[in-house]
């Protein structure tokens, strides 16, 4: 149970005195204040107890007893809050989860990049086309994608739309994951379809057959555990817009501590992780599990300072380092971070984000990623942990459940010339359903080789 936001206003707002990167410039501060006041009265989207449960699951990841699968859109869009989109995304994550659980013989913690991922940090504040300069698109929670002045003006009313879109998404996710749709046998049947129709299916056929035998064996023994019928699924997003996140921060009536009830887990991005800035300050005040994206410029000293600021009690499950180095850098840059952090005695979860360091512009002008680069970064991540005797804790991917053509390569090979066919992302290129499942089978093989 959570109590009214008003009691927490001062404790959760210490970030306001510090510089905050990547915040929209709203033309009417009064309108923003009115929206924030309204959001403060809204009910929580998630409960503190669920955040605690995820923290316990992440503790298992940090200790090497579980694996994190975190995935979803680069940026969600308001017009994609449909049952089909959400179901397909969930279906893809559940299929990946089933493969990883079986092949790695390890519990898989399933966290969606979903129900709140409506904002994007950008490298430039403006965009120029044909001599016209407008504010850059920062995600549906801030402004419109269309390139015209009216659409691009940041509008605080969109924060309420983000709340409502997140609420309806979460409602569907909760219904799907507890209402029989996530039944393991159903998920396995979808995987069998994939193996039959995928060009790289032969590789995975043996694994699918093993899972089939295991399920048949259990059925023959008369075992039909309740756990097969539902799935634990958590929501996460980047905590970027601090006005929104702090408006949805509440005091937990059980403990008197602050929780950001906009999602179970939030992370701080590569562009907003300055130690003396507002985002880290905000994250230090809430009890949710926290992720931090670490790019190739991160030093071991910085990593240790994040632990000091965000996990002073050294609590496994509290802090996750999501590493996004690029396939060409991960083997050089990651070892020192892992060594120094491990030597400090902190137990953090190490997760690879093989997407963000591997983006390039195709000749066609599309932003894309090579499936082989994504795979190579995951391989490098596993190699580093194997060499150091530490635990590769999980994978953070941008994916969709639809058959889009945004990343090149994969079993159903997509070529640069195919990108225009279904390039639908609002921001960065995502793995499609088939590429995501390819990745799950390949990661499962890597995990087995550990």
Range-by-range predicted roles:
Residues 2-67:
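N-terminal basic/disordered segments at the start of proteins
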Residues 58-61, 99-101, 282-283, 384-388:
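A general structural signal for short secondary-structure junctions and capping/turn motifs
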Residues 63, 262, 285-287, 344-346, ...:
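Short, well-ordered loop/turn elements at secondary-structure boundaries
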Residues 64-65, 350-352:
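Short coil-to-beta-strand
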Residues 69-74, 111-114, 352-355, 398-400:
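Short loop/turn segments at strand-loop or loop-helix junctions that form parts
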Residues 75-76, 81-326, 369, 377, ...:
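Active-site-facing alpha/beta catalytic cores
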Residues 120-124, 193-196, 332-334, 360-364, ...:
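Short acidic, glycine/serine/threonine-rich loops at helix termini
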Residues 303-306, 318-350, 356-404:
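Non-transmembrane, aqueous-exposed alpha-helical and coiled segments at domain scale
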């Amino acid at each position: 149970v959570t109590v009214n936001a008003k009691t927490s206003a001062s404790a959760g707002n210490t970030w306001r005195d510090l510089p905050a990167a990547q915040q929209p410039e709203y033309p009417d501060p009064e309108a923003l204040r009115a929206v924030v006041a309204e959001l403060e009265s809204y009910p929580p989207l998630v409960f503190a107890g669920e955040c605690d449960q995820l923290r316990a699951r992440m503790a298992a990841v940090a200790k090497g007893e579980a694996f994190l699968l975190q995935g979803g859109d680069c940026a969600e869009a308001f017009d994609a809050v449909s049952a089909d989109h959400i179901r397909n995304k969930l279906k893809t994550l559940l299929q990946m989860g089933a493969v990883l659980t079986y092949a790695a013989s390890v519990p898989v913690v399933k966290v969606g990049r979903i129900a709140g991922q409506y904002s994007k940090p950008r490298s430039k504040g403006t965009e120029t086309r044909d001599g016209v300069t407008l504010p850059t698109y920062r995600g549906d929670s801030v402004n419109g994608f269309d390139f015209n002045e009216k659409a691009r003006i940041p509008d605080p009313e969109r924060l309420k739309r983000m709340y409502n879109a997140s609420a309806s998404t979460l409602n569907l996710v909760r219904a799907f994951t507890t209402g029989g749709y996530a039944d393991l046998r159903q998920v396995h049947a979808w995987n069998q379809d994939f193996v039959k129709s995928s060009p790289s299916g032969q590789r995975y056929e043996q694994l699918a057959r093993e899972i089939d035998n295991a399920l048949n064996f259990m059925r023959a023994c008369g075992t039909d555990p309740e756990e097969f019928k539902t799935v634990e699924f958590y929501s996460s997003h980047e905590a970027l817009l601090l006005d929104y996140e702090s408006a949805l921060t509440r005091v937990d009536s059980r403990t008197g501590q602050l929780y950001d009830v906009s999602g179970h887990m939030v992370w701080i991005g590569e562009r907003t992780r300055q130690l003396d800035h507002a985002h880290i300050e905000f994250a230090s005040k809430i009890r949710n599990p926290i992720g931090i994206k670490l790019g190739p410029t991160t030093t071991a000293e910085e990593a240790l300072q994040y632990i000091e600021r965000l996990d002073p009690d050294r609590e496994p499950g509290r802090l996750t380092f999501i590493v996004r180095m690029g396939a060409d850098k991960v083997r050089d840059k990651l070892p020192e971070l892992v060594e120094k952090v491990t030597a400090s005695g902190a137990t953090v979860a190490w997760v690879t984000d093989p997407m963000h360091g591997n983006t390039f512009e195709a000749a066609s002008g599309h932003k894309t990623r090579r499936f082989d680069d994504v795979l190579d970064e995951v391989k490098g991540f596993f190699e580093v942990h194997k060499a150091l005797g530490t635990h590769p804790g999980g994978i953070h991917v941008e994916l969709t459940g639809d058959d889009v053509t945004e990343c090149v390569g994969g079993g159903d090979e997509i070529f640069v010339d195919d990108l225009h066919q279904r390039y639908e992302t609002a921001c960065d290129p995502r793995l499609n359903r088939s590429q995501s499942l390819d990745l799950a089978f390949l990661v499962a093989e890597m995990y087995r080789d550990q």
